[in-house]
């Protein structure tokens, strides 16, 4: 099979994903963040007081990698780690005011990319595309099993 010909759909999905990733990466870079740091901030925002183990599971990364992500965020005063009274072995993770502001900026990046995607679609096309992409995702997900 020649890419771009018989595999036109997969080629276009790949290109759209690549364009989206470049956009997100570029926007995060202006904030001094990478994708893992932004995902960690978002998770901590949604799960205030979470522990590192839960973040490791969410990110799907090794503990050492997540430790480095957290160190970088802590050095930039975006998060704080606190030892709870009842368990001195596990530190809870919380956003600082600066971290909360960064989360808002990160979320705006995704709002902006969603707006760019929707700009070229009618409401009906949006709904149809979303439905079709969910079908493709479900089909590909069952292939992983």
Model-flagged regions — what are they?
Residues 56:
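The alpha-helix within a helix-turn-helix
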Residues 1-31:
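N-terminal leader segment of winged-helix/HTH proteins
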